[in-house]
Amino acid sequence: MIKPIKILGVPVHPFTMQESVDWLEEKILAKQQTFVVTANAEIIMMCQEDASYNNIISKQADLVLPDGAGAVWAGRHLGYNVPERVAGFDLYCNLLALSAKKGYKAYFFGGSPGIAEAAKAKAETMYPNVNVVGCHNGYFTVADEAGI
């Protein structure tokens, strides 16, 4: 695995889109739960202001990708080879295409009520063979957690 670089102390993996998809496919095949952050400049700056948030991003995320021109520029300005921006939306579209091709499962989680359902419907239109096994908005109770 390519070692992360540090942008204002935040570890960022300088992967290409394809390297990101390949790395995540390895995790899918290993059935390994993985926490991915697509970090733009705002997220990196928020890590400077909020120690709890920084801990989540810097210590708990398995993969932090440069999502945004600011993150790519900062990495390059610091002398690192950051090949490209890996936007979260584009990454998820690539993963949905891969899932449709290889039969992997997808799940939509988060957002206001109705957003995950709309995303599921859109994904099923864009990727007819995708297997979306469920969706849930970002509002839930402790009692809901087991079902999610």
Regions found by a protein language model. Give the residues of each.
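N-terminal nucleotide/polyanion-binding subdomain common to many enzyme families
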Residues: 1-85, 89
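Conserved beta-alpha
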Residues: 75-148
